Amino acid sequence: MAKKSSSRLPKRKGEYTYRGKTVSELQELSLEEFAELLPSRERRSIKRGFTDGQKKVLHEFKEGKKIRTHHRDMIILPEMIGIAIEVHNGKEFVNVELQPEMIGHRFGEFAPTRSRVNHGSAGVGATRSSKFVPLK
């Protein structure tokens, strides 16, 4: 009996591509040409232009400085691939290593703002039935 390959997990063959273009091809494109490959929301955001804060982040990136930012709405561009940045999640800065799969997404998608709550067990007297549970 032959083994079935898992159809849920996509097989990775070779280099990562975004809309049919490799990372090196994407890095050679101008910003306007790259914007045409993006989904409409990101494309419109880039065509409107970057904010002053986003321009500062791009400038720091080009100088090779360590990037710590509150600009969670900044779109990840192909030229940013391979660097580590720190994105603020509302409480602290979260380390994010930019990988090719992240192209076209925003910084904030990789720094979650909410953490899962782990409630403890209820105390004695918290419910009516727990009044009759003997203490240790």
From Swiss-Prot:
<dbReference type="GO" id="GO:0000028">
    <property type="term" value="P:ribosomal small subunit assembly"/>
</dbReference>
<dbReference type="GO" id="GO:0022627">
    <property type="term" value="C:cytosolic small ribosomal subunit"/>
</dbReference>
<keyword id="KW-0689">Ribosomal protein</keyword>
<dbReference type="Pfam" id="PF00203">
    <property type="entry name" value="Ribosomal_S19"/>
</dbReference>
<dbReference type="InterPro" id="IPR005713">
    <property type="entry name" value="Ribosomal_uS19_euk/arc"/>
</dbReference>
<comment type="similarity">
    <text>Belongs to the universal ribosomal protein uS19 family.</text>
</comment>
<keyword id="KW-0694">RNA-binding</keyword>
<keyword id="KW-0699">rRNA-binding</keyword>
<dbReference type="GO" id="GO:0006412">
    <property type="term" value="P:translation"/>
</dbReference>
<dbReference type="GO" id="GO:0003735">
    <property type="term" value="F:structural constituent of ribosome"/>
</dbReference>
<dbReference type="GO" id="GO:0019843">
    <property type="term" value="F:rRNA binding"/>
</dbReference>
<protein>
    <recommendedName>
        <fullName>Small ribosomal subunit protein uS19</fullName>
    </recommendedName>
</protein>
<comment type="function">
    <text>Protein S19 forms a complex with S13 that binds strongly to the 16S ribosomal RNA.</text>
</comment>
<keyword id="KW-0687">Ribonucleoprotein</keyword>
<dbReference type="InterPro" id="IPR002222">
    <property type="entry name" value="Ribosomal_uS19"/>
</dbReference>
<dbReference type="InterPro" id="IPR020934">
    <property type="entry name" value="Ribosomal_uS19_CS"/>
</dbReference>
<dbReference type="InterPro" id="IPR023575">
    <property type="entry name" value="Ribosomal_uS19_SF"/>
</dbReference>
